Amino acid sequence: MTRDMDLIRLLLLKLEAEPLDGNLWRLDLDDLGISDYTHDEIAYQMVLLIDGGLLDGQRELSGGFVARKLTWAGHDFLDSVRDPAIWAKTKDGAKAAGGFTSDLLKALAKGLLKKQIEEWTGIKLDL
């Protein structure tokens, strides 16, 4: 199975919007309202989110997931790709380069956001 950055982004957006049940999310993947992907595809991307340090959580023996929170890195990544127009440009840039890593996607999205902020404010950012 391959990493699907569109699904990764969608999962982060969904998780961020979910209310916490106490200090945990107990996630039944079928209840997330993601109909364009199979249960196995969603589960695999959840494992990648945890392995990649974007989500603090674990898979339960039942096959569900328990998550404590999006990590700082998870919030940073999501903030860099939240805007649909920035996300589309980020993916286009990655495709033109012939490949990508999550760090490259984040850096590309961050660069696009930086450019957009500089255009809106007239303030040059040194990031």
Q: Language-model segments: which ranges?
A:
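Short amphipathic alpha-helical interface segments
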Residues: 2-34
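Non-catalytic, well-ordered alpha-helical scaffold segments
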Residues: 5-9, 43, 68, 72-75
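Generic structural signal for hydrophobic core residues of well-folded globular domains
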Residues: 15, 49, 78-81
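Basic amphipathic alpha-helical segments that dock to polyanions
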Residues: 41-53
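Short beta-strand "wing" residues that participate in macromolecule-binding interfaces
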Residues: 57
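Short, amphipathic alpha-helical interaction segments positioned at domain boundaries
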Residues: 66-97
